[in-house]
Amino acid sequence: MAEAFRGEYNQKVDAKARVSIPAPFRRVIEAGDPKFSGGRSSFVLVYGGDRSYVECYTISEMERIEERIRSLPMGTPKRRYLERNMITLALNMELDEDGRIVLPPKGREKLGISPDELKGGTEATFAGTLNKFQIWKADTYAAELAAEEEVLLPPGADMLSLLEETGL
């Protein structure tokens, strides 16, 4: 995979729930949108699953995921779960001419952004995770990140030691 979502960006969410997609992420979205030929690009925002953030996939990556779901036997609990949380609870999103999206109501609900917070102004954190990116409410992201690091690694440990289990 040549193109990847990397980095962490804090972006303002305005009173109309508009938020700018970080420019480096826009390039990856464009590269992963087979119909993109300039102008507006699209991606898929998934708000299903038991988590406090939404995940966003390029159109090409979502097509790969859908193929994997289709390969599961119909009617099985695993397939139904994935269909519901990855397909039903997902939205196609299109960037406007300024590289923004309107965070949909279901996405705002998942992030815990209230109407009052929108009026007063809030921030979202965009976190690149290789083949997808996550959108978090900024303060939730900071708290989760701190808690996760505390559990996974003792202070001063080499983070690459986590790769040793993969055999690479």
Curated annotation (Swiss-Prot):
One of its GO terms (molecular function) is transcription cis-regulatory region binding. Keywords: Cytoplasm, DNA-binding, Repeat, Transcription, Transcription regulation. SUPFAM superfamilies: AbrB/MazE/MraZ-like. It comes from the Bacteria. Its main location: cytoplasm. GO terms for cellular component: cytoplasm; nucleoid. InterPro entries: MraZ (IPR003444), MraZ_C (IPR035644), MraZ_dom (IPR020603), MraZ_N (IPR035642), MraZ_sf (IPR038619), SpoVT-AbrB_dom (IPR007159), SpoVT-AbrB_sf (IPR037914). Forms oligomers. This is Transcriptional regulator MraZ. It comes from Cereibacter sphaeroides (strain ATCC 17023 / DSM 158 / JCM 6121 / CCUG 31486 / LMG 2827 / NBRC 12203 / NCIMB 8253 / ATH 2.4.1.) (Rhodobacter sphaeroides). The gene is mraZ.
